[in-house]
Amino acid sequence: MRIPAHQFFTHEEFQSRLDGVRSRMDERGLDALLLTTPENIYYLTGYQTPGYYYFIGLIVPLSGDPILIPPPHEESLVASYSVVEDYRLFADTESPLLGIASVLGELGLARSSIGVEYDSWFLKIREYMLLRSALPDARVHDGSGLVETGRLIKSEREIEYMRQAANIATAGVQSGLDAIAVGASE
């Protein structure tokens, strides 16, 4: 793992999260997992995207380093936020899913058991079909829930962030209540 410019969790925490996902992948007999949900990608990498309108992917092999597939115009954010060392960019004119199929082939996973987040709002049917046609010998399974299961159990750092957020929200609500008065504008 690399050290990004802005890191909100320790390397040990990211590694623990990755280990948990891999354990659940192994239980389901998956050799790789393709994540397309930005929150799940953030959970494993620290990578934050401002653009939910572009494809973002993360390939998590059962062994070996994960590979991030960010939009090309967000390359600078990889250095700023992601702990993942290996990332691949694909031009806006290319299909990132065909690129992902190529990377899976590079990793020797084109004929393996691959989990895909069927519940993701961020994988279009057309993209999924492109992936399937590019990997005709792969056994594709539902990988939904493998990350979310780990996200249910909060670390000490996550709990601390939640407490800080609650304190900020409480202060904001109190300020609003204090500002309420007859004739006051919004």
Language-model features: where?
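Short regulatory/linker helices and ligand/cofactor-binding micro-motifs at input modules
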Residues: 176-180
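A composition/biophysics-driven feature that prefers long, compositionally simple stretches
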Residues: 1-171
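Short, intrinsically disordered, charge-balanced linker/junction segments flanking boundaries
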Residues: 183-186
